[in-house]
Amino acid sequence: MTLTIALTKGRTETQVLPLLAAAGIHCEAIQAKSRRLIFADDPSFHFILVKAPEVLTYLNHGTVDIGIVGSDILAEQGHRQFDMLDLNTGRCRFILASTADFDPKQTKRKLIATKYPHIAQQYFQKQGEDVEIIKIEGSVELAPLTGMADAIVDITETGTTLRENHLKVFAELASVSTHLVVNRLALKQKRTEIYQLIQSLQKVRPQEASL
């Protein structure tokens, strides 16, 4: 039976394709970097390339059997599918960052800019703080630099962008990596094929992931 997989475009795609190829899946057409978004060249595996926030949408509607997406999206959106495998790629961290003069212990109500309002809200609730969340798409780093927000919650891999913009990390919230998520119904209907894929990827994925 054919498995249909939603793969996150961009950095995740670039990092995961070598793993898929090493697991014996034909990825040449995707690696050719055309403008195609649907790939059905391998009779056993069909792929669609989508933006990260859309992976769970396709998965939840049963359009695809499997989604390959960052755990940041899983944590932010929430999901009702099976998170089956950490691929140990795309490692980065959720962080709280701001300018050097920011005081995280300050008692006044803080303004926090982020692409991840749910995760940010959860973090500050655990800290016992009531904050105002400003959702931003794009360069979140600008928010504390322009005075629009006191701090940001974002993901970082190396911290280079933060350093270049003179921002300091005040807390690490969680680690992030790329995960393989399976539709509940697909796991019942295509159990053998899905577990064969997972076993193949377990053999070729990085065993230890580091930042």
Curated annotation (Swiss-Prot):
GO terms for biological process: L-histidine biosynthetic process. GO terms for molecular function: ATP binding; ATP phosphoribosyltransferase activity. Heteromultimer composed of HisG and HisZ subunits. GO terms for cellular component: cytoplasm. Catalyzes the condensation of ATP and 5-phosphoribose 1-diphosphate to form N'-(5'-phosphoribosyl)-ATP (PR-ATP). Has a crucial role in the pathway because the rate of histidine biosynthesis seems to be controlled primarily by regulation of HisG enzymatic activity. Belongs to the ATP phosphoribosyltransferase family. Short subfamily. This is ATP phosphoribosyltransferase. Disulfide bonds: none annotated. Its main location: cytoplasm. InterPro entries: ATP_PRibTrfase_cat (IPR013820), ATP_PRibTrfase_CS (IPR018198), ATP_PRibTrfase_HisG (IPR001348), ATP_PRibTrfase_HisG_short (IPR024893). Pathway: Amino-acid biosynthesis; L-histidine biosynthesis; L-histidine from 5-phospho-alpha-D-ribose 1-diphosphate: step 1/9. Keywords: Amino-acid biosynthesis, ATP-binding, Cytoplasm, Glycosyltransferase, Histidine biosynthesis, Nucleotide-binding, Transferase. Its EC number is 2.4.2.17. It is found in: Cytoplasm. It catalyses: 1-(5-phospho-beta-D-ribosyl)-ATP + diphosphate = 5-phospho-alpha-D-ribose 1-diphosphate + ATP. It holds the Pfam family HisG. It is an enzyme of class 2 (transferase). Lacks the C-terminal regulatory region which is replaced by HisZ.
